[in-house]
Amino acid sequence: SILQQAVEGKLCEQDPKDEPARVLLERIKAEKERLIAEKKIKKQKPLLPISEEEKPFDLPKGWELCRLGDILIANEYGTSQKADDLNGSIPVLRMNNIKSNGEMCYSNLKYVGTNIKDLPKLYLEKGDILFNRTNSYDLVGKTGLFEENSRYTFASYLIRLRIYGISNRYVHLCMNSNYYRTTQIEPYIVQQNGQANYNGTKVASTLIPIPPLKEQNKIVLKVYSLMQLYNALEEEIQNAKKYASQLMGSVLQEAFSVQETAKPAQVIEFHPDQTIPETELLAAARGKIREDTWEHLCKRALEIAGEES
């Protein structure tokens, strides 16, 4: 998959002139120690060194493997304050607001007031990552990236992760990759009372492959571009399926019609986003369709058949 290639360093070409990730991580460590000394962030529990057995694959030159906690300056559960549909002005993001693909969904919100004890500490900041620690088996461990400018908070089934010195978009992509899912999440899921749970204290120990900072940004741009292309193709395929279904219905209607009525000759051009009138579908069924349009339909039909086989 795209994300798997991204975290293995196979999506973008490496530039030997880029500052190595090792230097970047050393600088982040020094900056965090300064922030701790200034009492701007809390001191974290020591993290274990990474053993050879834990390393999932060979990294490209200039990359480093680190624990997520090495690049965090905040790692905390959300509010347990009861939220409702009517009272309050601050939206509360909950586990259902993170989609299976890691996108954030801002519908079906509940609210709390500004006077609860968890605020302002638990206001979300743009760039915060939300980790789903309790949900169904398929959704537990999914992460969303908060990129709103408005005031939101989050519920206790989510964990807020605030990244420091690394592209939060890159980390978000990494945490939704197949690598992260199969090696860092699934082995530690616990099924309990009909729900899947992930120990929140484990998150900081998970492993993140870190490229040089410039390459992180290249990877994010490449993945976002490919995702947009994928979504556009998916929409075109759905439109083609809809057209094929309409065409098949007209073919069957034509084949089993008791009384055939002559139709004037027509030339049909293919437009994926249009709703095809019945008369045009019947004309297409009789073969009155431009050759290049027919070739396009045949090619798309073969692609659809290949995807569904």
What are these regions (language model features)?
Residues 50-54, 69-82, 96-128, 298-302, ...:
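Sequence-specific dsDNA recognition surfaces
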Residues 56-59, 116, 159-163, 204-210:
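Short, well-ordered beta-strand elements within core beta-sheets of diverse protein domains
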Residues 79, 99-110, 129-154, 169-173, ...:
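Short, ligand-facing micro-motifs at secondary-structure edges
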Residues 21-32, 223-226, 244-252:
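Short amphipathic alpha-helical coiled-coil/interface segments
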Residues 151-158, 169, 190-213:
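A short glycine-rich beta-alpha junction/loop motif
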Residues 1-54, 263-265:
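Extended, domain-scale alpha-helical bundle/helix-rich regions
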